[in-house]
């Protein structure tokens, strides 16, 4: 096992980079290697407050389904945004009150979500994602770094999702060169490795490396910005709208022929992104209908669970594993 300290999601580099860097060492990184999903689930269930971030929405649902229901939550984009906001509020309240709070999430919780867990598990991903995950552990610096573990793992029998292969490869290259993954040099090297693997053009379109070139000698280390720009490189998905809460009324207006930016902006709070194979599964099960070109509505309410969101499987027996 390899152990090294991590910093939070943002680093201020001012007159004395080394001193400022030391001030942000709040967690300890532990490389766990391969775990069986049942073993991971048992470890999570044994902890009172813990965050586990995985790469697949289906994995998140499976892990959640094997946890004690009291104080356990599943956060993925299979929950529409308004629903996620409600759950996040409950999560923050339980963390604040010291109540049991076990959260299984995909990477969405790494993007600007202000939560503070005493322990974090992160499935193997790019260094940008690992450091963002670390920013959700001991965020307020109230616990010793040695007691604030960020554990990196792979799951037995699961390969790295294709869209993350180059990120993971770049991280592994950095691990061979640097003991401290959170050092500014390691992070810059990570993005340089990624640029080499991906090709300059794709990264230059998002101006990721330019940000490092401008700010490595400046005041703010642009890590959060770079991570967010990485997320702009997306995979194709369509939106299925869920007729729950205000979403039901908004969809009725859409079906009646109303079309406006305001309506679609409001509807966005009730949309779930699905990939083509997942949409096909829902179509084959007769669970969705197309209101108009590219606009889908869930018609089988039994496929939306109040805890885990839109089902990955329907009565056809097919499934989408992303």
Q: Where are the regions a protein language model picked out?
A:
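Single conserved hydrophobic/aromatic residue that forms the stacking wall/gate
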Residues: 2-13
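Short coil/turn segments at beta-strand junctions that form active-site/ligand-binding loops
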Residues: 48-49, 70-71, 98-100
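Conserved two-lobed SF2 helicase motor
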Residues: 95-110, 122
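Glycine-rich phosphate-binding "P-loop"
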Residues: 16-37
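Conserved beta-strand scaffold positions in the cores of enzyme catalytic domains, especially
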Residues: 14, 26-29, 72-74, 120, ...
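Conserved catalytic network of the ASCE P-loop NTPase/AAA+ motor domain
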Residues: 4, 45, 94-98, 112
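Conserved ATPase-coupling elements of RecA-like P-loop NTPase cores
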Residues: 113-117
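C-terminal helicase lobe and adjacent C-terminal extensions/tails of nucleic-acid helicase motors
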Residues: 39-47, 53, 58, 62-68, ...
């Amino acid at each position: 096992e390899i152990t090294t300290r991590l910093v939070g999601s943002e680093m201020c580099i001012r007159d004395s980079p080394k001193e400022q860097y030391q001030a942000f060492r709040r967690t300890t990184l532990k490389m766990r290697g391969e775990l069986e999903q049942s073993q991971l689930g048992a470890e999570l269930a044994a902890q009172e407050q813990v965050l586990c971030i995985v790469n697949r929405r289906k994995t998140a649902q499976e892990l959640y389904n094997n946890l004690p229901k009291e104080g356990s939550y599943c956060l993925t984009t299979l929950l529409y945004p308004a629903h996620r906001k409600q759950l996040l509020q409950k999560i923050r309240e339980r963390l604040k009150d010291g109540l049991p709070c076990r959260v299984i999430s995909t990477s969405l919780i790494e993007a600007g979500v202000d939560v503070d867990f005493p322990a974090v598990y992160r499935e193997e991903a790019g260094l940008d994602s690992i450091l963002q995950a670390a920013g959700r552990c001991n965020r307020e610096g109230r616990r010793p770094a040695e007691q604030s573990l960020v554990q990196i793992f792979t799951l037995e029998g699961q390969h790295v999702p294709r869209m993350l292969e180059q990120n993971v490869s770049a991280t592994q290259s950095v691990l061979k060169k640097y003991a401290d993954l959170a050092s500014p040099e390691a992070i810059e090297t990570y993005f340089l490795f990624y640029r080499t693997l991906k090709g300059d053009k794709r990264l230059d379109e998002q101006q990721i490396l330019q940000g490092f070139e401008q700010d490595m000698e400046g005041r703010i280390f642009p890590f959060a910005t770079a991570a967010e720009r990485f997320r702009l490189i997306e995979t194709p998905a369509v939106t299925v709208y869920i007729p729950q809460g205000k979403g039901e009324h908004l969809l009725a207006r859409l079906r009646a022929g109303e079309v406006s930016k305001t309506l679609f902006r409001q509807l966005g709070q009730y949309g779930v992104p699905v990939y083509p194979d997942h949409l096909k599964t829902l179509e084959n099960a007769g669970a969705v209908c197309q209101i108009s070109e590219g606009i889908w509505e869930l018609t089988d309410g039994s496929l939306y669970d109040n805890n885990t969101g839109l089902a990955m499987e329907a009565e056809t027996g097919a499934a989408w594993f992303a």
